[in-house]
Every structure is written in C-alpha cells, then in structure tokens.
C-alpha cells in the first residue's frame, strides 16, 4: 500500500498498473459479533467510537465489471453513522442477502463490514469487461451499486430490484486504503480540488441533484421558490447551491445564527433561523400544532413577498413533515429523501389532496444524475462543503460529530493521503474558486 501511495504522491500515475495489488489493506469496519453492543441504549447515547474499528482486512478478489481503487480520501455520511450504531437495522443482513445473489457477490458476506460511500482516489486495477477506465485514472465514485440484469433498471437504474448503496448495503466501502466498486460507479475527479475536497460531495451532491433538479425528483425550474430544511448541512448545502445556480429562490431553514451566516455566504438571501423563531411543530409526542405550521407559512410569505414554496426539500422527516405538507404551494411538491428525526410521518391530508400537492420519494441518484452532479462540481458551479477533516484513525470521532450534528456541511477522512491539500491538478481554476471552496472550512 505504501508503494502505491508513494507513486500517487510522486505523480507516477502511469506506473500504477505495474504495481502489485496488496493482499491486505486497512479499512474502517464494524464487526458482526458486536451488533448488540448498544442494546438498550437510546439512539443519542450510541457512540460510533465504540463500534468503528480501523483494521487490516484481506483484499477482495476483483471480478468482471469491477475496479479496485486506491483511496486517498473519503467522508462520513449518515449511513456510516447508521451502520456504526446498528440502526435502524444491522447492515449484516444486507451483506448476507447480497452474498446469496451469485458466486461473484458471495465475497461481500463477511463477519466484518468495511464502510463508507464516498471516495476520491486512483484506479489500481480493473476487471474483465471494463474499457472506460484504466489504472492511473484519478476518480471519484458515486454510491449506486446495481446489477442491471432486470429490465426495470434500464429506464432508471434506481428502479433496479438489485440496486444497493455501496459501502452501506455492500462491503468494501470507501473509508479504507483500497475500495472495490463497480466500474459504472466511477467518475472523473475534478482537477481543481484536493483529494479530501473531491471525496466530500459524492453521495449528498448526487442525492440533492436527483431530489431537486432531475425530472425524477422535483424538476426544479427558474423562479421556483424552494424551502430547504437544514440548508447549511451536508445535503441542504448542495440543494441551496443548486437552487441559486438554477435560477430558483431558496428559502433556507437553519437552526442557529452561525448557520444562517453560512447560507448567506453561499448567496442565499431568504433565511429562517428556527432557534430565533422558536417553532414547536409538536405539542407532545403524539399531537402536532397546526398553528405553528401557519406561523411558518406566514414567515415564508413575508420573506418571499407572498409566495408559498413550489418545492419543499424534505429530509428531517417526522419533526417537520406535517409543516412541509402544509406550507407547500397549491399544486406544489414535497420531495423527501430521508427521515433523520423519525420515519413515521404524520400530516393533515386535507392540505395535500384538496390543494393538489404531491409527495415524491427520492433516493440517491442514477449514474446519469450522479455524473451531471459531478460535472457541476468540475465546472465550478457547485462547490464542496467540507468543514473538517480527520485522519482515518479518528473516524469514530468524525462519525460522532455527524451523529450528534456537531458539524457543518461534510466531514472528511484522509485514508492514503498523508495530509490535506494534495491532489490538485488545475491550479488556475482552483484560484478562481478558492473562496467558495473554503467557505465551510473551520465553521
């Protein structure tokens, strides 16, 4: 592994294909025999530092259509946190089912799970049938792993019955020195970004693109008013940028004055600070307060000059969903991709059916959508929202930060890269966008 890292750091990328693939590598993993380690504890008390381990593991066998990537940097997503606390289910069930699919997938069913759904690195080897990529290519990866043997997946690969999220529902993820991916997960690394910056957008940028921009999601157009929950977070920060770049009008909901300042630095003008407004959408565990929905709607109209949101960008889930359905414009769209505050949503259906609103479920992105989202990064139209970077040995703390929402934007992790700031190829473009690239750093 050290020889591979040294070749990459020396820019000897043409030599990569001649280097031996190591028999083992270090990866961040959870263990099957520790699935019950948090049993009986409330979710908030489950500490990823207890369950995430950095260990030496065997390098998986490379199969047809696959690639082994030398990973320079990765990042932490909520699915890493879910894996680490074994909620809502243990991911070992995913690996067991995937392992039964074929002889090729059997290797994923192991007593450990190497996690991570983002990477930036260099292709080390490609399997039979891979023609687009070669050893030495600098790449990032999106996290859709799909078999594409069913006709349902050929219209939209997210509809494939064998669609999985790499590093969450499959093994050999990106929080490691090496990763195993399908070749159709690979995309060109933006040359003006460092390894850690390039690794940060993948999952959340692609998710936001499908959810907000794609015809498979809200199909946002110029002039749309878009209410964005958690607008300074890992997902919302990309939705905010896409709304601004697409000619829409984002109304950014944040939870502190500091987060309000972050979205203003991105260019947002209409900002709602939930902490200052004191919204309480739930009277108690069982009953919501429609008067609070109305108060939110009034605030939105004050900011927009009387317009209700054409689109509500939803991901908090239970806590906000009733309010989201209420405040959306007549004929508007509530598009949801997650439920971080709870999966059991409750809303007043009269505001949905009588006002001809629609709820759209959105999950990650297909290859085309992920590619287009990455292209926006490469063009300098969308920028990473990386706030902090940890070494791989401290990945438990990185996951804890995300678990406790003690972070802004994305939290990065160095794997093979020995330090931050490496991997830039296009210095002129970087200089042009440096302020935007760094606006989340240190916040």
Predicted regions and their residues:
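C-terminal hydrophobic helical "lid"/dimerization subdomain
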Residues: 2-23, 322-326, 367-443
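A short N-terminal beta-strand-loop micro-motif at the entrance of redox/enzyme domains
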Residues: 4-20, 35-73, 112-114, 129-130
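Glycine-rich beta-strand-centered segment in the early N-terminal region that forms part
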Residues: 58-75, 88-152
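NAD(P)H dinucleotide-binding glycine-rich loop of Rossmann-like/cofactor-binding domains
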Residues: 102-111, 117, 144-230
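Hydrophobic/small residue at the entry helix of a nucleotide-binding pocket
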Residues: 207, 234-235, 319-320
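Helix-to-beta-strand junctions that scaffold the AdoMet/dcAdoMet cofactor pocket
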Residues: 221, 328-329
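Adenosine-nucleotide cofactor-binding segment
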Residues: 228, 244-319
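Rossmann-fold NAD(P)-binding glycine/threonine-rich loop
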Residues: 339-355
């Amino acid at each position: 592994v050290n020889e591979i890292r040294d070749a990459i750091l020396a820019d000897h990328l043409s030599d990569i294909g001649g280097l031996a693939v190591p028999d083992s590598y270090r990866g961040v993993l959870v263990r099957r025999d520790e699935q019950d380690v948090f049993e009986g504890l409330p979710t908030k008390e489950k500490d990823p530092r207890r369950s995430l381990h950095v260990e030496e593991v065997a390098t998986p066998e490379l199969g047809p259509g696959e690639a082994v990537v030398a990973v320079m940097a990765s990042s932490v997503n909520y699915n890493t946190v879910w894996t680490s606390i074994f909620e809502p289910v243990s991911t070992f069930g995913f690996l067991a089912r995937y392992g039964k699919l074929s002889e090729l997938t059997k290797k994923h069913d192991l007593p450990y799970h190497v996690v991570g759904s983002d990477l930036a690195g260099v292709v080390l080897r490609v399997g039979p049938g891979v023609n687009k990529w070669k050893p030495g290519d600098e790449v990032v990866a999106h996290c859709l792993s799909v078999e594409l043997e069913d006709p349902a997946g050929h219209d939209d690969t997210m509809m494939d019955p064998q669609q999985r999220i790499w590093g969450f529902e499959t093994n050999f993820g990106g929080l490691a020195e090496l990763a195993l991916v399908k070749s159709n997960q690979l995309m060109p690394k933006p040359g003006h970004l460092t390894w850690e910056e390039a690794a940060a957008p993948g999952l959340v940028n692609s998710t936001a693109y499908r959810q907000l921009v794609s015809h498979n999601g809200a199909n946002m157009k110029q002039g749309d008013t878009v209410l964005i929950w958690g607008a300074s977070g890992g997902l919302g920060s990309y939705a905010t940028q896409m709304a601004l770049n697409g000619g829409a009008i984002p109304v950014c909901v944040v939870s502190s004055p500091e987060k309000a300042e972050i979205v203003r630095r991105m260019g947002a003008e209409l900002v709602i600070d939930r902490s200052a407004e004191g919204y309480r959408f739930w009277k108690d565990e069982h009953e919501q307060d429609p008067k609070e929905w109305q108060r939110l709607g009034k605030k939105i109209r004050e900011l927009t000059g009387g317009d209700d949101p054409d689109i509500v960008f939803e991901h908090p889930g239970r806590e906000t969903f009733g309010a989201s359905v209420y405040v959306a414009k007549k004929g508007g769209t509530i598009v949801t991709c997650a439920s971080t505050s709870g999966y059991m949503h409750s809303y007043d259906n009269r505001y949905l059916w009588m006002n001809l609103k629609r709820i759209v479920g959105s999950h990650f992105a297909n290859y085309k959508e992920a590619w287009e989202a990455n292209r926006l990064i490469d063009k300098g139209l969308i920028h990473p929202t990386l706030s902090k970077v940890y070494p791989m040995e401290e990945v438990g703390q990185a996951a804890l930060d995300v678990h406790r929402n003690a972070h802004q934007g994305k939290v990065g992790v160095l794997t093979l890269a020995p330090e931050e700031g490496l991997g830039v190829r296009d210095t002129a473009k970087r200089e042009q966008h440096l302020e935007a690239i760094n606006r989340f750093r240190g916040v």
